[in-house]
Amino acid sequence: MKKNYSYKNIQAIDFTNLNDGEKLLVLEFRNHPNTALWMYSTFISLKTHLQFIEDLKNSPNHRYFLFKEEGVYLGVGSITKINFFHKHGYLGIYKNPFLKNGGETILKALEFIAFEEFQLHSLHLEVMENNFKAIAFYEKNHYELEGRLKGFISKDKEFIDVLLYYKDKKGYNDQSLLKL
């Protein structure tokens, strides 16, 4: 069984430990138009979703969490493509579309899991070049642009570039020291 984590008063519930209601809630968040718009595939069926969660039980390099704070579900965060030898992984977030905020709380908890619990050296992420809100969010949280995948995503008969961002443990530690 995969482990759940806590960061301050935030619970990170591993997808493999979700109850049936939480599984449906995650699917509702994921398929919400405001979330699906920025995903590589726009709609996920219940059958596909449940199979994905089942497959995660045998996938040590992919961790997905539902984040909860004081009974409120904030959204989902993931660390995927984890390479424990080279100590890096890919970060992903989608917040509860019915809440105004929550992304920053999820990000801080995910970074804690990645850098403190998993002892990773760096986190990487992909964001569509036209997702200005996400780009501003990650840059505000000290993620640095490291590259571009040209014409990587096909959406509405158009090819869109994907921007690559990263933060390493030094950037995480520097940011943590600023808050003391």
Swiss-Prot record:
Domain of life: Bacteria
Catalytic reaction(s) noted: UDP-4-amino-4,6-dideoxy-N-acetyl-beta-L-altrosamine + acetyl-CoA = UDP-2,4-diacetamido-2,4,6-trideoxy-beta-L-altrose + CoA + H(+)
Keywords: Acyltransferase, Transferase
InterPro entries to which the protein is assigned, alphabetical: Acyl_CoA_acyltransferase, GNAT_dom, PseH
Molecular function in Gene Ontology: acyltransferase activity, transferring groups other than amino-acyl groups
Function noted in UniProt: Catalyzes the third step in the biosynthesis of pseudaminic acid, a sialic-acid-like sugar that is used to modify flagellin. Mediates N-4 acetylation of UDP-4-amino-4,6-dideoxy-beta-L-AltNAc to form UDP-2,4-diacetamido-2,4,6-trideoxy-beta-L-altropyranose.
Protein name as it appears in the record: UDP-4-amino-4,6-dideoxy-N-acetyl-beta-L-altrosamine N-acetyltransferase
Species for this entry: Helicobacter pylori (strain ATCC 700392 / 26695) (Campylobacter pylori)
